Amino acid sequence: MQPHLSHQPCWSLPSPSVREAASMYGTAVAIFLVILVAALQGSEPPESPFPYHIPLDPEGTLELSWNVSYDQEIIHFQLQVQGPRAGVLFGMSDRGEMENADLVMLWTDGDRTYFADAWSDQKGQIHLDTHQDYQLLQAQRVSNSLSLLFKRPFVTCDPKDYVIEDDTVHLVYGILEEPFQSLEAINTSGLHTGLQQVQLLKPEVSTPAMPADVQTMDIRAPDVLIPSTETTYWCYITELPLHFPRHHIIMYEAIVTEGNEALVHHMEVFQCTNESEAFPMFNGPCDSKMKPDRLNYCRHVLAAWALGAKAFYYPEEAGVPLGSSGSSRFLRLEVHYHNPRNIQGRRDSSGIRLHYTASLRPNEAGIMELGLVYTPLMAIPPQETTFVLTGYCTDRCTQMALPKSGIRIFASQLHTHLTGRKVITVLARDGQQREVVNRDNHYSPHFQEIRMLKNAVTVHQGDVLITSCTYNTENRTMATVGGFGILEEMCVNYVHYYPKTELELCKSAVDDGFLQKYFHIVNRFGNEEVCTCPQASVPQQFASVPWNSFNRDMLKALYNYAPISVHCNKTSAVRFPGNWNLQPLPNITSAVEEPDPRCPIRQTRGPAGPFVVITHGGRH
């Protein structure tokens, strides 16, 4: 007996015969030339449309849309599948691996089509989950595409499920080209699979009204031939018009060339320093030997967009200054192309559109760098899985540089290079950590965007801002030192705040003298392998360290207890007055308490299994 089918969208409980089948099979989907709506447990569709969209694969076969309910702590997903397919998988994993992934599966055995919550083991073998936390709401076939609507709680407390938080999520997908007789017959190693990064839980921020005099400026790299390599960072230098008067940027958004939505991964606009009247023009790969060195001084972030992000609006009371004689006219656009299928011949003119106004807002928004100084004094040994480095914006600096009323941080962009895995900035006051400014426990250096904070953070005089980065150097044989090079490392949080102050950089590094004492200790217990002579550079010294457990532990202890050099810098790159060397680490006696995840109340269900809803031969 067939379940009820309809060519019109509807929301109803499954028929009794389906419920009986559910105890044996679980949930399944009609896929061939029918429209099926199956509502489970009286589920309702999301009232508002899906505001967020991303292509999952470069060919455009899979497109994901989603809608977030913070009240119910549930995400509704809509997955569009183009063309006739034997099935798809979609899910999440810690770093984008297909192994140990939390999955939802749609597959056919050649006769029936099934939908089920599943997971993959460390060998990529797929298994049915004992808790079916992905709930199918609707399946609809239109022309040559299939649309699946399903939902899942943020937190399920199922050990096989991924905890969805407001940091980066590594989405995985796969396309099944042939039937499988059972779910257990599927292994991810034999599928066409891929990875996409996104922030699923975006803060609910109201959209300010645009003023009548708003204007736009497009920063686009013209007619780029996208390289057929997997990863390309493209740099383009442009300039503002001569005598461009002072304006406020109040919003920006991405402009992505049609057809390239799956290839343009993220983009940033940087303002160059004002040290020179002119910067050389350039339009090419950022790692090109032809790229002028001066482009490294174009690193003041004006705008940053990543796949899945919508337009970025500044608070009504603040805007980012653009123009005037006191700032550089030169801007650098950086576009990250992600081309895992090595597609050739694709042209692109993507970029970022700035919305600006001559009606200056009450406050100018500033950008402050927190974290570590770009210096080889801070290093990560090779073969490390979770090595942590921490930079401090000390109470002495905030006391001297911030206004009495404090500042309000409303957005943040975390940044490391290739080995960064986690980043967090915490505000401390009176020796106690008070709140997290921003955190990403699944950070990826290939997915960077300016993110609005759920709640603005007020920083007062005397507060401490602590930024920690966790690195993984398992695949490296030499120490990774801090610096500007892509194979060197950084630990930075660009915080966006108002009102703008003279303080542009508040960072730290270990004291150089204490680092040299570390090298002397290594020599004392290691037969003089590290040169401590004046002509040896710090990178050379780190390259000579034999990385046994003693030397690793000693370096960790050095970074955790040794005095620091604080860079409390003005916009002119000059430090605020005072002696900033040999400063003690801030004395923090308590950490921020982490809330325990709230587990949903589970409804009593029958044995988990793929629930057959319809066979291919059913009438419709």
From Swiss-Prot:
Cofactor(s) the record lists: Cu(2+)
Residues in compartment: Cytoplasmic: 1-19
Glycosylation positions in this chain: N67, N187, N274, N475, N569, N587
Keywords: Catecholamine biosynthesis, Copper, Cytoplasmic vesicle, Disulfide bond, Glycoprotein, Membrane, Metal-binding, Monooxygenase, Oxidoreductase, Phosphoprotein, Secreted, Signal-anchor, Transmembrane, Transmembrane helix, Vitamin C
Post-translational modification, as annotated: Proteolytic cleavage after the membrane-anchor leads to the release of the soluble form. N-glycosylated.
Intragranular side: 41-620
Tissues where the protein occurs: Chromaffin granules of the adrenal medulla and synaptic vesicles of the sympathetic nervous system.
Pfam families reported in the protein's UniProt record: Cu2_monoox_C, Cu2_monooxygen, DOMON
Residues annotated as binding Cu(2+) A: H265, H266, H336
Site description Cleavage, residues in chain: G42, S43
PROSITE patterns: CU2_MONOOXYGENASE_1, DOMON
Topological type in the membrane: Single-pass type II membrane protein
GO cellular component: apical part of cell; axon; chromaffin granule lumen; chromaffin granule membrane; dendrite; extracellular space; neuronal cell body; secretory granule lumen
Pathway connected to this protein: Catecholamine biosynthesis; (R)-noradrenaline biosynthesis; (R)-noradrenaline from dopamine: step 1/1
Binding site for Cu(2+) B: H415, H417, M490
Subcellular location: Cytoplasmic vesicle, Secretory vesicle membrane; Cytoplasmic vesicle, Secretory vesicle, Chromaffin granule membrane
Biological role: Catalyzes the hydroxylation of dopamine to noradrenaline (also known as norepinephrine), and is thus vital for regulation of these neurotransmitters.
Subunit field text: Homotetramer; composed of two disulfide-linked dimers.
Protein name (database record): Dopamine beta-hydroxylase
Organism (species): Rattus norvegicus
Lineage: Eukaryota, Metazoa, Chordata, Craniata, Vertebrata
